[in-house]
Amino acid sequence: MAQKVILGAEDIRRTLARIAHEILERNHSSRDLVIIGMYTRGVPLANRLAENILRFEGLEIPVGTLDFSLYRDDLDSQRFHPTIKNTDIPFSINNKIVVLVDDVLFTGRSTRAAMDALIDYGRPKAIQLAVLVDRGHRELPVRADYIGKNIPSSRDEKIKVRLTETDGRDEILILDNEAGEV
């Protein structure tokens, strides 16, 4: 297997609709809810979740974007050179329920870095994590509150999420080590 499509565009649409319903159910359509997307692909996912919530409940949820690259624990690595993006959180997160959104949960290190960055913007009532894919292999004690799809994978495999906003189409692929980038 060089690459295999795990989810297509319609599957992703349905998955995000389900996650939006789960967020509403857990938080009782709370007006204290804000959604923040983690760069890169968490940003369009956050926007789509907010659009679904607006469509389902008529509730307009504030959406922000978070660049956590300077909070990563591999900054001293020779192979990692961060491209700084714009954090845009034009609202207070104090006493808010923050739903942090990412495309793939793997080791938990990006989530830890994002939470560290987020705390610099205020003191949320709670932070919940929504991910499109959970692939396992945690190195830190991090668990998602909302999971689109669990995709068990080996460490040698790569999960590639493509979204229309960033990649021109919606799909989730699993690639073996020899497949490289596509």
From Swiss-Prot:
<keyword id="KW-0808">Transferase</keyword>
<dbReference type="GO" id="GO:0006355">
    <property type="term" value="P:regulation of DNA-templated transcription"/>
</dbReference>
<keyword id="KW-0804">Transcription</keyword>
<dbReference type="InterPro" id="IPR000836">
    <property type="entry name" value="PRibTrfase_dom"/>
</dbReference>
<dbReference type="Pfam" id="PF00156">
    <property type="entry name" value="Pribosyltran"/>
</dbReference>
<dbReference type="GO" id="GO:0004845">
    <property type="term" value="F:uracil phosphoribosyltransferase activity"/>
</dbReference>
<feature type="short sequence motif" description="PRPP-binding">
    <location>
        <begin position="98"/>
        <end position="110"/>
    </location>
</feature>
<dbReference type="InterPro" id="IPR050137">
    <property type="entry name" value="PyrR_bifunctional"/>
</dbReference>
<comment type="similarity">
    <text>Belongs to the purine/pyrimidine phosphoribosyltransferase family. PyrR subfamily.</text>
</comment>
<keyword id="KW-0805">Transcription regulation</keyword>
<dbReference type="InterPro" id="IPR023050">
    <property type="entry name" value="PyrR"/>
</dbReference>
<comment type="function">
    <text>Also displays a weak uracil phosphoribosyltransferase activity which is not physiologically significant.</text>
</comment>
<keyword id="KW-0328">Glycosyltransferase</keyword>
<comment type="function">
    <text>Regulates the transcription of the pyrimidine nucleotide (pyr) operon in response to exogenous pyrimidines.</text>
</comment>
<protein>
    <recommendedName>
        <fullName>Bifunctional protein PyrR</fullName>
        <ecNumber>2.4.2.9</ecNumber>
    </recommendedName>
</protein>
<dbReference type="InterPro" id="IPR029057">
    <property type="entry name" value="PRTase-like"/>
</dbReference>
